[in-house]
Amino acid sequence: MPNNKPNLLFVFADQLRASSVGYAGEEAVRTPNLDAFARTGTIYKNAVSMLPVCGPFRGSLITGRTPTSTGLVINDIPLRTDEISIGHCFKDAGYDTAYIGKWHLDGPNRPAPVPPGPRRQGFDYWMGANFEHNYDRSQFTDNAGHLQMWEGWDAQAQTSHTIEYLK
């Protein structure tokens, strides 16, 4: 029986204001792929972050809960492994799940690997970095739990890995 479930892709960007993209009228920044998403997807024109700091906001995106509910009120607090994440929900619905890119939900262990298991919050496939601001050949943890280096500019390497995973 064929699998008719659509692929779902969530893009979490650091430091991205709603006004800093081409489809919002920003001429100095070229964002053709985001502009294409905007033409065919949904644009939320009135969105508010409960806590616009990396870790707490990522925790909200992953769990659907507020930072005060998850306890992630500042950076470098680990997301509790008993939290229900989108990784768990999609996995329970029969999806293969993957997380590729910056995680920042495993506490202050910035360069340390995020090992396979509950700290990956239900994601089956993993190529993530708990925290990194190097952006060029920075470290990440591979699916087996080993530290690796992205090849070249992180965003491009992560995008390439995501495309390969989706194929």
Where are these regions (language model features)?
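Formylglycine-dependent sulfatase
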Residues: 1-167
